[in-house]
């Protein structure tokens, strides 16, 4: 009898064991399915669970078993318990996703711990408005205000906060004050000030969503530290939670939460927040192992997008450094004031602007451009037209001895063997000018700063500058010299030794004025030395970039020992305190090369603009250097031509045997008359 009773007991125990094992297996599979469905919302839920279980096993001395690989989700989206819970909550409240978890009155009561402050309400409203811009694009304070005013869900307390904080200036001041406060306190927004119709406005350039979330009420952020209850419909499915561990049934039946509360990324509760029972630091309260499970469902955390990356400590440090390196409003004002002062300093005065206007070409610009294709034939071929452009063109010179296959001559119109050179040469095509007829009469090219009567006629003296008496010439405002430096090359003219240059009587020519000294090659350092010996201080340097007949930079020059020279230098020295026009011209001249050692004619117009109506002297000149208002000295000039009576008299007294032209000079120019007393004083001295 006892045997039958024992057998029946064993059978009952075996059946109970089978049922329990099946139930455990069913619940285990259900848990795995639930984790699989939650993994798309919380990607790191499995590692967080394993970490919690591993920590629990270290305290309970039980072996740790990692979570097995999750199966594919088997539940359709519309039947998923989480989706079902969200749908029921939305039907219950009848609001959007933001009001699904927290009542609006409760959100106001928890807003930053200061629900009665209008600033806190306005900051929360502005932060909520900015967070809704996904993806974020820059906006201004006026747009934010319009969005807040047009919000149908705005409560009277929020509208009153806008009015109270804005005061007499209106709600726009409240929005801008809140933005500035948020930028200064935690750097959650990046702002820039601008003006609209004379009124200052604020532009929001960028936002930090992590920091903006802190402006919202705690319950709205999804990271509460209190065990708040979220009311849910009674139709939410309940499950039996075991008292022996995760996935094992127990004797007590409690409503099973769909997810645990706390941080949405880790799923952990805050540490040590239960009234009784020991909890692990920073982990979820394990039900059935330590303490008691809560007798209510836990609140749902806000979903975290799977593509959102957690900010690293290095990124936070960079944000802090960027915030610290930003200029304050006071620094920006000081910088703006400094820029305005610099602008005022560098802005030309009315006198300087009027002086520069005097030297502009009268009648407009008369510059004529050269065609980039050189000849009319190439111009028509490249443009695909039967008519060439209206720019200046060249014409190829093809002689009987020309070999077109050799290409263009390197020296072009400066070639010294034009009659026998086999390379192609060019000349300016004048057919366009002849067909167009005579040009419209325009005013002279020379600027209207000196008349012909003021400048006077050109004067020159053929002499040996090394032994000529410079003291009879008087003093000059401008001296230009192009010495025949000894550069150890074969030149078509004589040169001067270095010591002869150093001992020239140049100091007697000026007391207050400028000197322009042309140098080349090794003579650059010698020229600087001569300026210092003559009593000048070098202040500038002019560069002449040489171009050929086709307006291209020359590549085969006749000067240069190591490299072909495509430029020349002119040193500028100053003595005394002359009156000059500053900042009129530049220090670069681009001009065509002509005869050997001939300098560009642009120099004469430039020097006239720098010191108009001053006496000007050119040393080592040739006949092509003779210009109105200039006195030229050199050994390649045609005799002596002097117009100024005082200068003629002094020259005849010193050199009676030399004839002076013209025999009866015309009336002296006004410029020579004005400078005559100065010249006599220098001779007397």
Swiss-Prot record:
Disulfide bonds: none
Region of interest (Disordered), ranges: 657-685
GO-annotated biological processes: embryo development ending in seed dormancy; RNA methylation
PTM-bearing positions, type Phosphoserine: 664
Pfam families hit by this protein: MT-A70 (PF05063)
Family annotation (InterPro entries): MT-A70-like (IPR007757), SAM-dependent_MTases_sf (IPR029063)
Catalytic reaction list: an adenosine in mRNA + S-adenosyl-L-methionine = an N(6)-methyladenosine in mRNA + S-adenosyl-L-homocysteine + H(+)
GO terms under cellular component: chloroplast; nuclear speck; nucleus
Molecular function GO labels: mRNA m(6)A methyltransferase activity; RNA binding
Region (Positively charged region required for RNA-binding): 552-565
Alphabetized UniProt keyword annotations: Methyltransferase, Nucleus, Phosphoprotein, RNA-binding, S-adenosyl-L-methionine, Transferase
Ligand binding (S-adenosyl-L-methionine): 464-465, 482, 599, 622-625, 635-636
UniProt cross-references to SUPFAM superfamilies, sorted A to Z: S-adenosyl-L-methionine-dependent methyltransferases
Localization: Nucleus
Phenotype when the gene is knocked out: Embryonic lethality: arrest at the globular stage of embryo development. Arrested seeds are deficient in mRNAs containing N6-methyladenosine (m6A).
Main subcellular location: nucleus
The EC number(s) this enzyme carries: 2.1.1.348
General function of this protein: Catalytic subunit of the N6-methyltransferase complex, a multiprotein complex that mediates N6-methyladenosine (m6A) methylation at the 5'-[AG]GAC-3' consensus sites of some mRNAs. Associates with MTB, FIP37, VIR and HAKAI to form the m6A writer complex which is essential for adenosine methylation at specific mRNA sequences. N6-methyladenosine (m6A) plays a role in mRNA stability, processing, translation efficiency and editing.
Subunit structure comment from the entry: Interacts with FIP37. Interacts with MTB. Associates with MTB, FIP37, VIR and HAKAI to form the m6A writer complex which is essential for adenosine methylation at specific mRNA sequences.
Similarity remark: Belongs to the MT-A70-like family.
Protein name: N(6)-adenosine-methyltransferase MT-A70-like
